Amino acid sequence: MEHYIWLSMAFIFIGVYISKFLAHKTNTVDVLWFIIIGAVLGNFHLVKESHALEFLGDIGIILVMFALGFEEDAKAFVDGVKKAWGIALIGAIFPFIAGYYSAILFGFSQNSALIWGLTMTATAVSLTMMTLKSLNLHKTKAATGIMTSAVVDDVLSLIGVAILLPIILSGGDTGNLTINYTELSITFAKVIIFFVTVYLVGRFVLPHDNGLQKLFKLENGQYAVLGIFVIVFLFGAFAHLLGFHPAIGAYFAGLLLKEEYLQLGQDKFYNIKSVEDIIHNLAFVIFGPVFFILLGTKIIFDVNILGEVILPTIVLFLSVLIFQIISAGGAAKFTGGYSNKDSILIGLGMLGRAELAFIVINIAYVQNQLITQQEFYILVFTTFLLNISVPLLIKAYTPFYNKMKD
């Protein structure tokens, strides 16, 4: 049935066109329309699930994160990390609490409550950063705070998965609650190895840029993009090897690559501007949108079960939304020293739920049947609503942000 893959890709790219058009006509962000169009394509069975499509979506998000990292100022990022710990920690704990007690409120088991809480922790930074970019806010202090906090949040979420899933799988409701300290120690070791390696590469390897410039200047710079791809996928592979999403590695690849490495000269066939344009088009026009449209296709509406999940979904959505904005925004203000306007933007920017949410849902429902079909829809719909609220709320807040003083 290979023809379905090609047909699905055609519908996806048609969806990208429609999304871009609607975003322009309605003066809204295209990420919102990617998800909506994806939901339409999925419910009308115009895009079928495929490992090949998922792989293309993964490539898209990797390129998006690299492009965003490349546009980031490394020094600003390091300064931002110093402010990020409170935002990430507090901004992860409170959504977990909201998810946990929402499940308890509706009479679900402790296992379910842990799954609900864990699903609500990891932040979908790529969704937020694409939204900020479309509004020309991606180089603000708040954007740096969101990105750095989300990286730390991703680490905390991985640790949460390492701790809680073994507890749940070992029979949490029977009272046999045990923490696998071996797995937890391994996770901490991987975190340390990843960041130490990134630091060493950025501090001692890449500054000796002669080799990179020779690579990028081959054939008058025609292979510069290919050279970038090599570096991006090496970083992505290393991150994946240690249990991170490859997009995290790609972001750091972009962060560590400096523009001077691509100063190929105006007389060359390719210069830094043309290379940046190619990367931008691949990331934000071709492959990146594939990821977000596929994200939308995961929302399959079933009329029979919709009535049962409306109230729990609304309660979970509102509780996470309120807890996330207040906790992340408050932490940004009081632990990170951000201004009021940046703190609010950070609170809004931390709302989206990341791929880890769908991974947890998949493990809990598809692989281990730890949650019911009703819970599956509640978590998927809530994740969708949170993701779709990010561009809407940031778009609505942008005029106030631009008017407010630092």
Task: List PLM regions with ranges.
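Structural signature of hydrophobic alpha-helical transmembrane segments
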Residues: 1-11, 51-66, 110-125, 186-197, ...
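Transmembrane alpha-helical segments of multi-pass membrane transport proteins and ion-pumping complexes
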Residues: 12-20, 35, 39, 43, ...
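Transmembrane alpha-helices that form the ion-translocation and gating core
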Residues: 22, 86-138, 201-205, 295-401
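Membrane-interface junctions of multi-pass transporters
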Residues: 22-26, 40-83, 208, 212-220, ...
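Multi-pass alpha-helical transmembrane bundle typical of ion/small-solute transporters
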Residues: 25, 70, 164-224, 240-244, ...
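Juxtamembrane helix-boundary/capping and inter-helix hinge elements in multi-pass membrane proteins
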Residues: 28, 70-82, 106-111, 131-144, ...
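Small-residue-rich segments of transmembrane alpha-helices in multi-pass membrane proteins
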Residues: 32-44, 86-100, 148-164, 217-235, ...
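Transmembrane helix-loop junctions at the membrane interface of multipass transporters and ion channels
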Residues: 160-180, 236-241, 298-308, 360-373
